[in-house]
Design a protein with these regions (language model features):
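Rossmann-like dinucleotide/phosphate-binding beta-alpha-beta segment
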Residues: 1, 18-19, 134-228, 336-349
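N-terminal glycine-/charge-rich "phosphate-binding" loop or analogous flexible N-terminal tail
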Residues: 1-41, 309, 325-349
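Short, well-ordered coil/turn residues at beta-beta hairpins
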Residues: 6, 46-47, 69, 106, ...
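Short beta->alpha connector loops at strand-helix junctions that form conserved
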Residues: 26-27, 47, 69-70, 86-97, ...
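Short acidic/histidine-rich motifs immediately flanking catalytic phosphotransfer sites
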Residues: 38-43, 61-63, 199-204, 227-229
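Rossmann-fold NAD(P) dinucleotide-binding segment
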Residues: 51-63, 78-80, 213-232, 243
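Phosphate-binding beta-alpha-beta segment of Rossmann-like dinucleotide-binding domains, i.e.
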Residues: 84, 92-147, 159-162, 167
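Rossmann-like dinucleotide-binding domain for NAD(H)/NADP(H)
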Residues: 88, 220, 229-349
Length: 349
């Protein structure tokens, strides 16, 4: 069987070859490039761009398994994958610590004005400069005695809560309609509505996945609910925030500042208004990275494909409903799954 890999520095061709698979590799900038690479493949490692769309999957009749690095699978059309009997695999939990650490670092960069003061120090200002000292003292803040809000209370949101608790906030509140209060209690967190979180939190950190429900969850209306002194951090997915609305809100000082590891369009356009605002920090979607993450994730991403094509459960399955689709295929028109070991028990969800 053939495995197609979009070229990255982290591909583990050796694992596929040791398992007896043929490996092809290529760089893909367009949908046509991706189709050309995947059209004869049984399994594929795909990246964020180009999108693995319905058209791509339809053009690849042998494709059975897609595997993405990390947790996010918003670059894959999950509905199409499920309809066509294609597993969409991810690697949950592998970079939870890295993203939670980065979110805390970004919040501290805002509360302590780290980026501003590094710049002004390089320009010659120092603590003895009265102007700098007064300005700094008027705007720098502590986390203690403030309310921290978390949007999305999955693994990363919980890891963030654990870390931020050490700074002594007055309260930690969270919004996640899929989590029970008994779970939040384990972290000393109070679940609230989105409106209550936005109106009460001094610091807000976003850790939700990108779905139709959460796309532009933070928009002109929800931004208007926040305190004018609110600080907003996003290390989840860019389109959770309406970027244009956020830029307007920051420019008008309707909220105080934002720190973003992700943007609505990536890579971010050099002319994006957010980049020109002094009250915004942007990092290039690297919150989840570390040498440990890359090593673990590259192995698990490959194992997802090897295991699924061998009848074993992958590390993560983003479209568990596909199991029923494949079961029907096996009993009627086996198609792409003909000859592959039955994994219905191993993948039962």
């Amino acid at each position: 069987m053939k495995i197609a890999l979009q070229t990255t520095p982290f591909n583990r061709n050796d694992l596929f070859e040791a398992a007896g698979f043929e490996v092809v590799e290529g760089r893909c900038r367009t949908e046509a490039d991706l189709i050309a690479l995947l059209q004869d493949a049984d399994g594929a490692q795909v990246t964020t761009m180009p999108l693995t769309s319905r058209a791509v999957m339809k053009a690849c009749p042998k494709l059975k398994v897609l595997s993405r690095m990390g947790v996010g699978v918003d670059s894959i059309d999950l509905d199409a994958a499920t309809e066509m009997g294609i597993l969409a695999c991810n690697v949950p939990g592998v970079n939870t610590a890295e993203v939670a650490d980065h979110a805390v670092a970004m919040l501290l960069a805002l509360t302590r004005r780290i980026v501003d003061t590094v710049r002004t120090t390089r320009e010659g200002a120092w603590g003895s400069d009265g102007r700098l000292t007064v300005e700094y003292l008027q705007t720098v803040r502590r986390i203690a005695a403030h309310t921290v809000g978390i949007i999305g209370f999955g693994d990363i949101g919980r890891a963030f809560a654990t870390r931020i608790r050490g700074f002594g906030p007055a309260r930690i509140i969270a919004y996640d309609p899929y989590v029970e209060q008994t779970t939040a209690d384990l972290y000393g967190v109070q679940l609230v509505s989105l409106e209550e979180l936005l109106t009460n939190a001094d610091y807000i950190s976003i850790h939700t996945s990108l779905t139709q429900e959460t796309r532009h969850l933070i928009n002109e209306e929800t931004l208007s609910l926040m305190k004018p002194t609110a600080l907003l951090v996003n290390t989840s997915r860019g389109p959770v925030i309406d970027g244009a609305a956020l830029a307007r809100s920051l420019e008008k000082k309707e909220i105080e500042a934002a720190a973003l590891d992700v943007t609505e369009a990536e890579p971010v356009d050099s002319q994006d208004p957010l980049l020109s605002l002094p009250n915004v920090i942007v990092t290039p979607h690297l919150a989840g990275f570390s040498p440990t993450f890359l090593e673990e994730c590259s192995i698990r991403q490959a194992e997802n494909i090897i295991w699924a094509l061998s009848g074993k459960a992958p590390h993560g399955l983003a479209n568990p409903e596909v199991i029923k689709t494949i079961a029907v295929m096996r009993s009627t028109t086996p198609g792409r799954w003909e000859g592959i070991p039955d994994f219905s028990t191993a993948l039962a969800v």
